[in-house]
Amino acid sequence: LTPPKLGPIEIRVTTIRTGKSVTFLQFEMTQNSEVVLVATGSWASINEGIESPQIMIPEVPGPEDCPVPTRITDSPTRLHEKWEIRSVNQALSASFENNNSRMQWWIRPKETTPMSSSLIVAAADALPPPIFFQSDKIKMAPTIDLTIHVRVDIDSVQWNGASWLLAEFVTNHASGGFIEEDGLIWDDAEELKQLAALSHPKP
C-alpha cells in the first residue's frame, strides 16, 4: 500500500479459515499506525496424489560463470544491496538488453539466510522487470500485486550459504500504465521453488 521505512513495524495475523488440509491467513503490516501492507496466504499439507512433470530448470551457465549485471536500476537501491546477483543473459550475449523480454538471474542473499518461504517471496520481488532492459522510459516499477505459489516442501531443501537460486522472469503484457510479469525460481539442486505473478505500475 505504501513503502515501509526503516524502523519498527507491527504485523497482525488473522486466521480466516482452517480446513482439513488448507489454512487461510491474512497479514496486516502497520508502521506508525498506518497500514503499509496487506497479504493473504494459503497453507496446505502435502498429500499423495497426481504428480505431473516438474518444470525443468533451464540449461544455463552457473553463477560462477555469470557476471554481476551492468544495470539493475538507474541508481543503487537498499533492496539490491542485500543480494548477490549474476546475469545469465549477459553471460550468453553482450547485447541482450535491447531485445529480450525474458531475463534469467542467479540470486542469493549476501548474508547467510536460512531457506524459508519468506526468502523465496523476497527473491521473487528483488529483480527488475525484463521490460526495464527494453525501454529507457521506465525508471521505476513498484510492485502493487504479488502472487507466489511455493511448489516445494521447504524443510526438504538442501540450502547453505553457498547456494543460489535461479530466477527466470518474463514481461508478458504492458498496457494502461501497468506491467504484468511472470516468473519461475529454482534452487541450484534443480527443484522448482515457486511460480510468481507480479503487477507493476509504469510511471
Predicted regions and their residues:
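Terminal targeting signals and extreme-terminal segments of soluble enzymes
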Residues: 1-203
